[in-house]
Amino acid sequence: MDVLVTECSARLLQQEEEIKSLTAEIDRLKNCGCLGASANLEQLQEENLKLKYRLNILQKSLQAERNKPTKNMINVISRLQEVFGHAIKAAYPDLENPPLLVTPSQQAKFGDYQCNSAMGISQMLKTKEQKVNPREIAENITKHLPDNECIEKVEIAGPGFINIHLRKDFVSEQLTSLLVNGVQLPALGENKKVIVDFSSPNIAKEMHVGHLRSTIIGESISRLFEFAGYDVLRLNHIGDWGTQFGMLIAHLQDKFPDYLTVSPPIGDLQVFYKESKKRFDTEEEFKKRAYQCVVLLQGKNPDITKAWKLICDVSRQELNKIYDALDVSLIERGESFYQDMMNDIVKEFEDRGFVQVDDGRKIVFVPGCSIPLTILKSDGGYTYDTSDLAAIKQRLFEEKADMIIYVVDNGQSVHFQTIFAAAQMIGWYDPKVTRVFHAGFGVVLGEDKKKFKTRSGETVRLMDLLGEGLKRSMDKLKEKERDKVLTAEELNAAQTSIAYGCVKYADLSHNRLNDYIFSFDKMLDDKGNTAAYLLYAFTRIRSIARLANIDEEMLQKAARETKILLDHEKEWKLGRCILRFPEILQKILDDLFLHTLCDYIYELATTFTEFYDSCYCVEKDRQTGKILKVNMWRMLLCEAVAAVMAKGFDILGIKPVQRM
């Protein structure tokens, strides 16, 4: 239905433009006063009448489509923009691209939403030498508002703000739809492909805390786009190529000479890496052999390739333990995947005349970028620049991506801006058509506000960090004596949910561009905007129906038969807050700042607490505790909050539990 509404809206606009053009032509012919043009005039008038008739039919069909029930949640801001866009066009038909500003109101006294277009329109009219007061413009806009299902009333405030009050029936119906059909968005990304490049550790090195942010942010972005209906390809651009493999293979040959026939028990790959690095730095003969191994690997020597694969497999097993723990799914496509494309990349840039030679290197200067790309080293080797150019081309032409998102730290910002600019320069993509974006992020700091390290100054291993999280979350649960009321299975589920949920939420709840301080004490605090608080809040909400002996089937029956009342101010506030979910997600789809979702879930939880403290869902006898009355419409509000929170958690990669 959403696609049909969009198509109808586009056709409406087109026909309105045609009518405007024909009306102008009719007026011109009338004003000419030349009777010889009467045949033309009659023909134009007839065409105009036909168009107006068709326009009327289209408008009716569009309204009929809008009135049909939809299974998707409505983005209230988008719907209000449609309504006010229509009003502005009707009030000021000659203005091209007038500003359309609809935002949630900051205070209840200003209504539920505000349209702040009048001031911008006043400025546009001033450039046409028409001085009109913004308040007059606001009044003119409100006079042209079409009939719609969502607005109860509008008020003009201040210099020209239009305060919008939603209809209670509209909000109630949307909440009922959410409960009956589940939390669903319109298929915004239908037939669109998104590639998310994230995590990307190096083979033979353990993942450390520096990889944590890319992995968590990238997974969450992927989940969001999947929920919005996009075809998402999650890529792990691992470092599985380069000179370091020469020393690893040479060390493997020495330590496990029968590696071709007997699987080598490498064990701790980190130790293995350090041993080979030490030899590479101190033994000249070993260093020469390491370089020979690199050449043989590039030449696809079968024995050397097998050694390389063995090392990659051992490393991959360790990486997968972390991905499994964090519930992250990725397709591995490392630097090795692009090796056979490198020569063609260099040739394409040469053929187009973009290559300069500098001290034996082949470099490419990109307009607007201060540092050139090095696409071929003086020794004939390729660079990260070459492999990243090969990757972006493959993703654009073979994968046919509509959007590519690179989740890599802020330190790589200049590099990626240069890669993107080079890809545009050579004509691989048009930024107006294809979105290529670097979702950068800051570093993880310790509580001393320096880079997060162990006490001995080593980089913190990610597996150790997650293990510490599990230990601390269990300590917290036992401190609250949850081990005495939960089964062993429930206790373990709660431990994992809190440990990994808190680590993810602490990251995602900060603006990704900023550095953030890693503190287990803060992230496990069950007060404030933390996963611990929200997970506890979620289990409390889920328990309300259970403690009132209301099961899932009864709730579903009530959702279809019981009208959700929003008469109490806290019911009304909560209902509106629930409906903001689609507009929050749309904002994140645009800017990729996931802390907005965390802030929203926290706001939803605190708004629910206000509601629950003021509005009885279950009324009990004060002496006996016996249930006297269940206010089912309020139980449904609880259920709607839980449904939206559950979907929010899912997008953030957090697994809530029913009991905690």
Swiss-Prot record:
A motif ('HIGH' region) lies at residues 201-212. Its EC number is 6.1.1.19. SUPFAM superfamilies: Anticodon-binding domain of a subclass of class I aminoacyl-tRNA synthetases, Arginyl-tRNA synthetase (ArgRS), N-terminal 'additional' domain, Nucleotidylyl transferase. GO terms for cellular component: aminoacyl-tRNA synthetase multienzyme complex; cytosol. It comes from the Eukaryota. L-arginine binds at S200, P201, N202, H211, Y384, D388, Q412. Residues 529-543 are annotated as: Interaction with tRNA. GO terms for molecular function: arginine-tRNA ligase activity; ATP binding. The keyword Lyase does not apply. Keywords: Acetylation, Aminoacyl-tRNA synthetase, ATP-binding, Cytoplasm, Ligase, Nucleotide-binding, Protein biosynthesis. It is found in: Cytoplasm; Cytoplasm, Cytosol. It is an enzyme of class 6 (ligase). It catalyses: tRNA(Arg) + L-arginine + ATP = L-arginyl-tRNA(Arg) + AMP + diphosphate. Residues 1-72 are annotated as: Could be involved in the assembly of the multisynthetase complex. PANTHER family: ARGININE--TRNA LIGASE, CYTOPLASMIC (PTHR11956:SF5), ARGINYL-TRNA SYNTHETASE (PTHR11956). The alpha-helical N-terminus (residues 1-72) mediates interaction with AIMP1 and thereby contributes to the assembly of the multisynthetase complex. Interacts (via N-terminus) with AIMP1 (via N-terminus); this stimulates its catalytic activity. Interacts (via N-terminus) with LARS2 (via C-terminus). Monomer. Part of a multisubunit complex that groups tRNA ligases for Arg (RARS1), Asp (DARS1), Gln (QARS1), Ile (IARS1), Leu (LARS1), Lys (KARS1), Met (MARS1) the bifunctional ligase for Glu and Pro (EPRS1) and the auxiliary subunits AIMP1/p43, AIMP2/p38 and EEF1E1/p18. Interacts with QARS1. Part of a complex composed of RARS1, QARS1 and AIMP1. Forms part of a macromolecular complex that catalyzes the attachment of specific amino acids to cognate tRNAs during protein synthesis. Modulates the secretion of AIMP1 and may be involved in generation of the inflammatory cytokine EMAP2 from AIMP1. This is Arginine--tRNA ligase, cytoplasmic. It comes from Pongo abelii. The gene is RARS1.
